[in-house]
Design a protein with these regions (language model features):
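Extracytoplasmic metal-acquisition and chelation regions
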Residues: 1-250
């Protein structure tokens, strides 16, 4: 949206590729970046709860990218202390990502009216790159999805997949024996050929289930960060997720 606009510098707060932001802690450099920022573009929907104190101390304008998006209830997980009411992983649906981009367009346009036309042109060019729905998703041999990350609800809904089970694993909060047995039972009942981990997360439990049931283990990408070069790397990552699903469940 900001490409080619003089005087606008975009920096990513969370630059590392991580599996989960639930327990992210702001670094000293993060705090400095927030203090210097004129505008903070946030995912919203509770994803950046870790920024509460920093936001209260900041004079920056805030653009909430989740405005206008119908949010799904957060998935509950045994033994996990996530207080978010709604699932914040809205960018995992390309239609929602376009709404997010539109929110950025309107937010920046209101703050910087002289460059509104440029923001509009950039947003339109980016939107034109979003591909049509992949027909392979309509003809999968197995439409059932089991993931080891709680962020694939929007992705599943957008692609006509039935998310049977989502296990959120992180340090100090591994899957329980009951959750593991539930996944084993589901794999056998629905004859599921593959289960999915997040590429920056642990595969240990999924591999154990694979040995027990014979199902394959594939990786999906939550795209928690990027290189700041525009929409194409995001679209490439989403396409790779689609290709992975088609290979694993097709």
């Amino acid at each position: 949206v900001t490409e080619g606009v003089d005087g606008v510098q975009v920096d990513l707060l969370v630059q590392e590729q991580i599996s989960c932001l639930h327990d992210y802690t702001l670094t000293v450099s993060d705090m400095r970046a927030i203090e210097k920022a004129d505008v903070l573009v946030m995912n919203g929907a509770g994803l950046e709860d870790f920024m509460g104190d920093a936001l209260a101390a900041s004079d920056a304008a805030v653009i909430d990218c989740s405005e206008g998006i119908e949010l799904l209830p957060a998935l509950g997980h045994e033994g996990h202390d996530h207080d978010t009411e709604y699932d914040p992983h809205i960018w995992m649906c390309e239609e929602s990502a376009l709404v997010m981009m539109n929110n950025i367009l309107h937010g920046l346009g209101a703050l910087d009216e002289k460059n509104l036309d440029c923001y509009r042109e950039n947003a339109a060019a980016a939107a034109a790159l979003v591909p049509e729905d992949d027909a392979r998703m309509e003809n999968l041999a197995c439409p059932y999805l089991i993931t080891f990350h709680d962020g694939f609800q929007y992705f599943a809904l957008d692609n006509g997949l039935n998310l049977l089970k989502s296990i959120e694993e992180e340090e100090g909060a591994e899957a329980s024996a009951a959750e593991i047995q539930e996944v084993v039972d589901l794999v056998r009942e629905y004859e599921i050929p593959a289960i999915f981990t997040e590429r920056n997360g642990s595969e240990a439990t999924a591999r154990a289930i694979s040995r027990e049931t014979g199902c394959a283990v594939y990786q999906l990408d939550m795209i928690m960060s990027g290189d700041g070069t525009g929409i194409q790397p995001y679209l490439d990552a989403m396409q790779k997720n689609i290709d992975t699903i088609a290979e694993a469940l097709g």
